[in-house]
């Protein structure tokens, strides 16, 4: 039996971004029709299958995907009628395998088609800037310099904790 992969999604007024989390899977079928999208793929050890029944109709000819990387298949789907959907699926219930892709999410009031024109399917941003690539390069850059925060002479005025415990023992009381 095929496994249901985790699907991440984000939308713009005229399109939907989908990221299907699969482990080194080969795409065997990717088909859009009406308000449905069907994905089927397999890896060396597992078979994956997902059928999404969208909130509204899509343009089946516009379904595009990147070749699967080691972990994900990224898909873009044009909406037949540009409009913000209140949810991705027609069914109002929650499904455990569907999550919001906050890396690509944009609120309705933030939408600017000019920015989207330069956005790539792989999470790229306008003008070719890819935040994911930038962040991966930050790994060995070191942190900010917080000079002067090591020892503060004001701390010398504080009494030692041991002195307080000895005094409490003499008085026979504890705070």
Swiss-Prot record:
Start and end residues of each CS domain: 2-89
Region forming the signal peptide: none
GO terms of biological process kind: chaperone-mediated protein complex assembly; protein folding
PROSITE patterns according to UniProt: CS
Region (Disordered): 109-175
Biological role: Co-chaperone for hsp90/daf-21. Involved in regulation of longevity, larval entry and exit from the dauer stage of development and response to environmental cues, such as oxidative stress, in a temperature-dependent manner. Role in daf-16 and hsf-1 inhibition at elevated temperatures.
Name of the protein in its database record: Co-chaperone protein daf-41
Source species of the chain: Caenorhabditis elegans
């Amino acid at each position: 039996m095929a496994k249901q992969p985790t699907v991440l999604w984000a939308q713009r007024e005229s399109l939907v971004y989908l990221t299907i989390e699969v482990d080194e899977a080969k795409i065997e079928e990717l088909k859009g029709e009406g308000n449905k999208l069907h994905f089927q793929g397999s890896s060396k050890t597992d078979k994956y299958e997902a059928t999404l029944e969208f909130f509204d109709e899509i343009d089946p000819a516009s379904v595009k995907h990147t070749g699967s990387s080691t972990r994900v298949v990224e898909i873009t789907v044009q909406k037949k009628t540009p409009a913000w959907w209140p949810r991705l699926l027609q069914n109002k219930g929650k499904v455990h395998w569907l999550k919001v892709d906050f890396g690509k999410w944009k609120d309705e009031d933030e939408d600017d088609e000019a920015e989207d024109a330069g956005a790539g399917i792989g999470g790229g941003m306008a003008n070719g800037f890819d935040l994911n690539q930038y962040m991966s390069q930050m790994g060995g850059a070191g942190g900010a310099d917080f000079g002067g925060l090591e020892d503060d002479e004001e701390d010398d005025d504080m009494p030692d904790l041991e002195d307080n415990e000895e005094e409490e023992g003499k008085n026979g009381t504890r705070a």
